[in-house]
Regions:
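Internal catalytic-core helix/loop-beta-alpha segment
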Residues: 92-119
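Hydrophobic/aromatic-rich, well-ordered segments within soluble, folded domains that form packed cores
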Residues: 117-143
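Short acidic alpha-helix initiation/capping motifs at coil-to-helix transition points
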Residues: 80-81, 109-116, 139-141
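Short, surface-exposed beta-edge/turn micro-motifs
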Residues: 23-25, 64-66, 118-120
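Long, compositionally biased
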Residues: 146-184
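A structured, charge-rich N-terminal accessory region that forms the first stable segment of a protein
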Residues: 2-62
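Short linear loop/turn motifs
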Residues: 63-64, 102-104, 136-152
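A glycine-rich, hydrophobic loop/mini-helix early in the fold
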Residues: 41-98
Length: 184
């Protein structure tokens, strides 16, 4: 399988809800050694998706295993403007309000710390703040799916179902050779 096809399959599998505008962001990991043209592909797809207000950011580009963060610019900015989210992220040292570039620089710094994974990233992915806090505090969850749910399980189940439909639709299209930018 070529690098482009592999990359599109990863986008369809992990980021369909973002690409279909139902979620602020999502991420996945790739081994650089298995996809040698990954940075060129990301530049290409950033160009293809820019008119749709979707961006792809590489986190930890020096690592052998990189994190690919796909996000809707406006939705992420809206999340960051919420007072409760700002206070939450500021408690982890994020210098809010700030540009997305500054936000990602701080997130990179947090990811590079060996002590613990920065689970506050869940808020950036668009998960409900109360669910991110519940996860960090290791509470008992009510439901597990795309994220651990601590409140409003019925609403979360509806979102999980929507996300699954998006992924299946995009994966089917990619399998049939349709470019991802034509599927969204």
């Amino acid at each position: 399988m070529n690098d482009r096809r592999s990359f599109e399959q990863m986008l369809a599998c992990y980021c369909a809800p973002v690409l279909k505008k139902h979620k602020a962001a999502n991420m996945f990991h790739m081994d650089k050694a298995k996809n040698l043209s990954i940075f060129a592909l990301i530049r290409e797809y950033n160009e293809k998706l820019s008119g749709k207000q979707i961006q792809i950011k590489v986190l930890q580009p020096a690592n052998s295993r990189i994190t690919i963060f796909v996000f809707q610019t406006k939705k992420l900015q809206q999340i960051l403007k919420r007072k409760d989210v700002m206070l939450f992220l500021q408690s982890f040292g994020y210098p809010l309000p700030c540009s997305l570039q500054t936000l990602f620089a701080h997130l990179e710094q947090r990811l590079s710390m060996a002590t613990a994974y920065p689970h506050e990233i869940g808020v950036l992915l668009g998960y409900p703040l109360h669910d991110v806090v519940g996860f960090i505090e290791q509470r008992e969850c009510l439901l597990r799916g795309h994220w651990n749910v601590y409140r409003h399980p019925r609403k979360a189940m509806q979102m999980f179902s929507l996300f699954e439909r998006c992924s299946k639709e995009l994966m089917r299209g990619v399998r049939h050779g349709i470019p991802i930018e034509q599927l969204i």
